[in-house]
């Protein structure tokens, strides 16, 4: 069982689907939620490769905390196709205090178990994870 110091247990399915996103590019994004009763992080939504960044942001609830990973494709100045895996810790101001604390205390453990995250973003408002912010983190 997890405790607040070490963070919530990460369900094996989360790790498997993340590896599929990273290695096989089976998914564009994954949204994760903490199930307090089960004491673990679980998958809430898998985004198909053809889904857009707007599809991704609309799948995250406005007033509840979530973790998410997004495989962002981009073209460099010298015309190379690349991708970076973003980790987004979504903790809106309108979410419950207990939920914010739970997600904050479990974040490091979650990231450790999702090996291959390249860029981290903390957002409390939709503007903090806009496409412009994402591109800015890539220096595009």
From Swiss-Prot:
Its main location: cytoplasm. The modification Phosphoserine is found at residue 6. PANTHER family: COFILIN-RELATED. Belongs to the actin-binding proteins ADF family. Expressed in the root trichoblast cells and developed root hairs. PROSITE patterns: ADF_H (PS51263). It is found in: Cytoplasm, Cytoskeleton. GO terms for biological process: actin filament depolymerization. Actin-depolymerizing protein. Severs actin filaments (F-actin) and binds to actin monomers. This is Actin-depolymerizing factor 8. It comes from the Eukaryota. The keyword Cytoplasm applies. The keyword Phosphoprotein applies.
